Every structure is written in C-alpha cells, then in structure tokens.
From Swiss-Prot:
The gene is proA. SUPFAM superfamilies: ALDH-like. It comes from Bordetella parapertussis (strain 12822 / ATCC BAA-587 / NCTC 13253). CDD domains: ALDH_F18-19_ProA-GPR (cd07079). Catalyzes the NADPH-dependent reduction of L-glutamate 5-phosphate into L-glutamate 5-semialdehyde and phosphate. The product spontaneously undergoes cyclization to form 1-pyrroline-5-carboxylate. This is Gamma-glutamyl phosphate reductase.
Length: 419
C-alpha cells in the first residue's frame, strides 16, 4: 500500500468513527460549533489572509487567470461573508430526527419515517476556499462527517480554514475528525477518496465539467452531481412579451458564469418578429454575442449562424443561442435532445401550456415566468446549498440540508406479532 493510500485509509477510518458520534450530536452542540467557527474566522482574519497570500502568489506565478485568482482570494468581504454564512446555517432548522409520513396500521402498529444523516460525505472542489467553510458547515449541521479535498492552488487557505473548523468542533465537544481537510496535493488522494466505499457514503464534486466527468468514471462511491447547466427559456405564443423580454435578458445577463444562466432561447414563431428585434438589440448592446437559426437571424442583424454545437454548449459567458420554433412540442423536443436536465423555463400566460411544460420537461427545476438564474438553494428557501444535482436518485435540484440526509423507517408497537 502506498503512503497516499495509507494516509487516505487512516483519514477514512477516523472520519467514519466520527460520523457515528455526529449522528448523536444535539442541535445545540452543532450550532455552538458553527457559531464558534464564525467568531474564529473573524478573529483570525490576519492569519487566514497570510495563508491565502501564499496561495495567491503561487497561483499568480503559475499564470492562473484573473477570474480564478479572484475566486481564490480571501478578501475582508469574503471572510465576513463566510462568518455570516456560518451564522445563517446555525439559524436553520435541524433536519435530523424529524418524523414524516406517519400512519397507523390496522393492527395498531405505528409506521413513520425519520430523517437521518447520510454518514460520511466527501467533497471535492477547485479554487474557492469559501467552499471549505460552506461544505463543512452544511455537513456538520446535517449531522454528517466530511472529508474535504480542495484544489491544490488553495492548499494553505484550506488547511488554515480546516484548523478553525476543527477548533469549533472541539469547543462544542464534538469530534475534530468529523471534518478533515486533505493536506496533500497528490491527485492520487482523489482517486482513493472516490473508491473508499467502506468509509465514504457519497461524493459531492464541485468544479468544472472535466473534473466531474473524470470522477463519474472513476468513482465507486455514489456521486451527487451535475455535469453542466445548458439551460433554456422558451417564449410561448401566449407570452406577455414585456415579461418575456425582462425574463430572457435577466436569465442571460445576471451572471454569465453560473450554472443557471440561460444558454439557449427558444421563441415561438408567432411572437418572434415582435420580440427578437428588441431583445436582440438589448443583448447586443450588453455585449452578448447571438448565434441563431436561419429564421431567428431574420430579426437578429448582429447575429451569427448557429450549429448543433451551439445547441449543446454551456457557454458560461456572453454568448446566446437562439432558435425559432413552431410549437411547444418542438421546444420541448429541443430541450429533451440538447438540454442537461438542470433548469428550464417557459414564459406564457396560458395555464395549460405552463402546466404541460412543467409536467413534461425532465429537468431538476422547471419554471413558469421566471428566469433560470433563480437556480440557487438560497432562492429556494433552503438557506444554503452544497451544489445542484441533476441525478434522478436521492437529491435533485439544489441540495440543501435536507438533501444531505436520508430517511429510515421507524416502527412502534405494543407487542403485536405477525400471524
């Protein structure tokens, strides 16, 4: 066994043991730990930023692009937001132990389901140190233990944040091994983590499509994941066009780099001539490159011809594919063929069209008269999220505290026997 395998095996064993203690942890103890972490993050701002400066300097020397450098940097504001996020998670209801789906059988036996932690969650992520705190906090609050493997470019930052997390656990009388930060940059650690079925119950990857595709191929542990967010807005024949304009513009331009950004606009032929010239001009003036089908280009003078690659692409940038369709069926067929199952929306004042779209479009979130950029756990009232899942099993859509738990059946009786 290699040194990395030995190290990861030890981490897995410690975390599995800690997970059993976390299942018994009270809500008060978990909240105490979270609040202690929030105080420590603010109190140790200078130490955190000193560790982060090492990561930023190395990343800059290695030519990391500006957008990723920005994500990597722990500014005063980002540190304050991490502390506030911890307080917000502490204030959320504890899902563990809640009882649902109760019934009484004819023999008097009481049947219910209880929400319980998943166990040990492995989180694999890239350059954002704040994920260390977000992931640790959500796993802690939901009664799980977690193994965190951040990007090599953020190693010093993640290790420093991990020490704060473990100090918070210790202050609340919880096992420090309940949150462990992998302190090696060896990629073999990731390969071992995703195959440790005896110690890890689920993996949550947060990163680019390349990372997630690789993990999906290598993992033996189940993944909560989405590969990409190729999101659509369909403007129906019965749409309010002022509403459609604002929704489509917001869905594309709110933030280009989020997985809920609209990447393809589908417009019914009956309204294309009235909507596309105005909307296209607004998007063009905002710096969005438009790529359209032949029919759409009639009303998009600045547009370029689209091909199949455009329908399949999550741009994560100021590019939008536009297609004119003749029916809602054609729109839904397009989404079924090219979509990623993330988030799709219809703009319409026709109730039956809205209901049909929500029923038949097979995505984790389906909206009526809303922009796709609402795909976020905070906007859903979840308080926070570990990520967004397009899986059909277990969690689907934004994954908050409840998505980090599972259900077990609990039955109570008075001595009944089965005849």
């Amino acid at each position: 066994m290699s040194s990395i395998e030995t190290y990861m095996q030890s981490v897995g064993e410690q975390t599995r043991t800690a997970s059993r203690a976390m299942m018994r942890a009270t809500g008060a103890a978990k909240n105490q730990a979270l609040l202690a972490m929030a105080e420590a993050i603010l109190a140790q701002r200078a130490e955190l930023q000193a560790a982060n400066a090492k990561d930023v300097a190395a990343a800059r020397a290695n030519g990391l692009e500006a957008a990723l450098l920005d994500r990597l940097t722990l500014s005063d504001r980002s540190i304050a937001l991490m502390a506030e996020g911890l307080r917000q998670i502490a204030a959320l209801p504890d899902p563990v132990g809640s009882i649902t789906a109760t019934s009484v059988r004819p023999n008097g036996m009481r049947v219910a389901q209880m929400r319980v932690p998943l166990g040990v969650i492995g989180i694999i992520y890239e350059s954002r140190p704040n994920v260390t705190i977000d992931a640790a906090a959500l796993c802690l609050k939901s009664g799980n233990a977690t193994i965190l493997r951040g990007g090599s470019e953020a190693l010093h930052s993640n290790v420093a944040l991990g020490r704060i997390v473990q100090a918070g656990l210790q202050a609340a009388g919880l096992p420090t091994a309940a949150v462990q930060v992998i302190d090696t940059t060896d990629r073999a650690a990731v390969g071992k983590l995703v195959t440790m079925t005896e110690h890890v119950d689920v993996i949550v990857p947060r990163g680019g499509k390349g990372l997630i595709s690789r993990l999906a191929q290598e993992a033996r542990v189940p993944l909560i994941k989405h590969l990409d967010g190729n999101c659509h807005v369909y403007v129906d024949a019965a749409a309010d066009l002022a509403k459609a304009h604002d929704i489509a513009f917001n869905a594309k331009t709110y933030r280009y780099g989020v997985c809920g950004a609209m990447e393809t606009l589908l417009v019914h032929a009956d309204v294309a001539q009235r909507l596309l010239p105005v909307l296209g001009q607004a998007l063009h003036e905002h710096g969005v490159e438009l790529r359209g089908c032949a029919r759409a280009l009639q009303w998009l003078p600045e547009g370029k011809p689209a091909d199949d690659a455009d329908w399949a692409t999550e741009y994560l940038g100021p590019i939008l594919a536009v297609r004119v369709v003749d029916t809602i069926d054609e729109a839904m067929d397009h989404i079924a063929r090219w979509g990623s199952g993330h988030t799709d929306a219809i703009v319409t004042e026709n109730l039956s069209a809205a209901q049909r779209f929500q029923r038949e479009v097979d995505s984790s979130s389906v909206y009526v008269n809303l922009p796709t950029c609402f795909a976020d756990g905070f906007e859903y009232g979840l308080g926070a999220e570990i990520g967004i899942s397009t899986n059909r099993l277990h969690a689907r859509g934004p994954v908050g505290l409840e998505g980090l738990t599972t259900l077990k059946w609990v039955l109570n009786g008075e001595g009944q026997v089965r005849g």
